[in-house]
Structures are given as C-alpha cells and as structure tokens.
Amino acid sequence: MNLAGMIDHTALKAETSRAQIETLCKEALEYKFASVCVNPTNVALAAELLKSDDAVKVCTVIGFPLGANTPEVKAFETQDAIKNGATEIDMVLNIGALKDGDLSLVERDIRAVVEAANGTLVKVIFENCLLTKEEIKTAAELSVKAGADFVKTSTGFSTGGATVEDIRLMRETVGPDIGVKASGGVRDFEGAKAMIDAGATRIGASAGIAIVTGGTSDSDY
C-alpha cells in the first residue's frame, strides 16, 4: 500500500502564510503525497512550486467551508481555480438544501461544478457531522448521478470529522468505481489505516507526515 500516495497534504486555515505553503509543497514533493490541498488564493503559488513533479496534484476547495454559495458562484470559482493551476477540486455541497430535501438543487449544485471542471477531478464534501445517515446516503447517490469522481466526509471546520462508520456507508452507496475521501481528525497511521480498511481511497490531512512516519498529530484537519 502506497500510503503517501493516498494523502492530500492539507493547509486550509485562514491564517496560512506563503511560507507555510512553500513548506507544504516541499514536504509533498519529498514524501510524494497525492496532492497539496490549499485555499484558492494559494493555488497559483502551489502550482508554481510543484511544476517540477506532475505526480503531486494541486487540490483546492470550492464553496468552502459552508457550501452556501450558489451553483453559479461555485462554477466560477472552479473555472478560476483551474485557470490558476488547480488539478483537483473539492467542493462543499449545499448542506442546507440537502437538509431541506431540495434534492434538485443539491444535484444542480454538484453538476455545475462538475461541468465547470470539464474533466478535472471533482470531490464532493458532505459535512457528515451535520447529516443523518439517510442524508449521507442521499448525498452520495446525488454525487454519483451528477458525475463527481469522489465523495468526501468533511471540511474539517465543523463539529466532527471522518468516522469509520460513515466511510463504510459512503463506500457501500457509491460502489467500487467512485473515490471516497476521509478528512477531518485523521492524525496517525492507525487512524488512516482504519479509514482505508473501511473503503477510503484518499485521506485529507494536515498530519500527512505523522501518518506516514508513524507519529501523531494534534491537528483537527
């Protein structure tokens, strides 16, 4: 198992500095992580720093962290991020619409990003800690229907992160051909392995180095 190649090495806090992005990218190249996951304002810098190695992708977040932008705004964010060098897109779905049962809006929201991405890989963030199990299942079904490539547990900025139980449910719902990303609270090798054993194919974490070296981090993301 190439664990490093399953990790999105992440720095999404509001106070993230240029120096921290430089360190993040240097570490991603050294450990050969799947991607760096950064806020849209840092995409161009990350793309420049990683241009020597196409294997490390530049992932960014859309409608983050609330998911409460309109589909049109999320589509523009997506196009702008790709123009700036993003090669993977993690979007937050419309959580309020899902809770309201407005499933047509949820699907349209996801589809708007998928279409704007135009072939660039799209992951859909659910924020499972705010959802019932049935809502998680519905979100997964709508993500597949709208053409997303991955489903993802959490932003890391709400009341809870990834759980083994939720990863199993998401994997069972989407089947074998869609990626499942565990994010939020994965801090060490044991935690990452538990998520992978449950069906995760990607781990989002700021604790990537601790995970691959057998250490432990106190990071919430």
UniProtKB/Swiss-Prot annotation:
GO terms for cellular component: cytoplasm. It is an enzyme of class 4 (lyase). Pathway: Carbohydrate degradation; 2-deoxy-D-ribose 1-phosphate degradation; D-glyceraldehyde 3-phosphate and acetaldehyde from 2-deoxy-alpha-D-ribose 1-phosphate: step 2/2. One of its GO terms (biological process) is carbohydrate catabolic process. Pfam families: DeoC (PF01791). Its EC number is 4.1.2.4. GO terms for molecular function: deoxyribose-phosphate aldolase activity. It is found in: Cytoplasm. It catalyses: 2-deoxy-D-ribose 5-phosphate = D-glyceraldehyde 3-phosphate + acetaldehyde. The active site is at residues 90, 152, 181. InterPro entries: Aldolase_TIM, DeoC, DeoC/FbaB/LacD_aldolase, DeoC_typeI. Keywords: Cytoplasm, Lyase, Schiff base. Belongs to the DeoC/FbaB aldolase family. DeoC type 1 subfamily. Catalyzes a reversible aldol reaction between acetaldehyde and D-glyceraldehyde 3-phosphate to generate 2-deoxy-D-ribose 5-phosphate. This is Deoxyribose-phosphate aldolase. The gene is deoC.
